[in-house]
A protein has these predicted regions:
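Targeting/processing segments of secretory and organellar proteins
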Residues: 2-4
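Hydrophobic structural segments
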Residues: 10-152
Length: 152
């Protein structure tokens, strides 16, 4: 887990070359530009879940879900922008309501401590060519494909 952030940063660097002063919202716009299939004016899960996207990017972390452990790691590494595939504040389940609220508040406190902005990149991430969930699973399972039948 310690190197999860480092492993993905080079992919974002490819997308972001040419931006001189990077604000978090600039990175988000760059990610959105890759998601031509997402209906941005309608229902999408991709959005800022916490924090200020108008701040300058110091370091970016990428994860499946920003757990407390991931956020603590981001604090240690000076990361102020986390791109998370899944929602970081799940509010359904069989947990006692007070424990759930306490857990959410603790996570918000950690994020506030590091002035960390979290962006959920779900719809783009699922289908982005070569790196999206669909393509990665196809490669992992050994499917040989060059063209997409559909661009979902």
């Amino acid at each position: 887990m310690a190197d999860d952030f480092d492993d993905v940063n080079h992919q974002l660097e490819k997308l972001l070359r040419g931006l001189k002063i990077m604000k978090i919202k600039d990175v988000i716009e760059c990610l959105k530009s890759e998601g031509t299939w997402v209906r941005w004016n309608r229902c999408t899960r991709d959005r800022v879940l916490f924090g200020d996207d108008d701040q300058e990017v110091k370091k970016i972390g990428v994860c499946w879900v920003a757990t407390n452990k991931v956020i603590e790691q981001a604090l240690e590494k000076g990361i102020n922008f986390i791109v998370s595939h899944e929602n970081i504040f799940y509010t359904t389940g069989t947990h006692l309501e007070t424990k759930l609220v306490e857990s959410i508040e603790h996570k918000k406190d950690l994020l506030s401590k590091g002035n960390i902005c979290v962006y959920r990149c779900h719809d783009v991430w699922d289908s982005i060519p070569e790196y999206g969930v669909s393509d990665v699973w196809a490669k992992k399972l050994g499917f040989d494909f060059k063209d997409r039948v559909i661009n979902s």
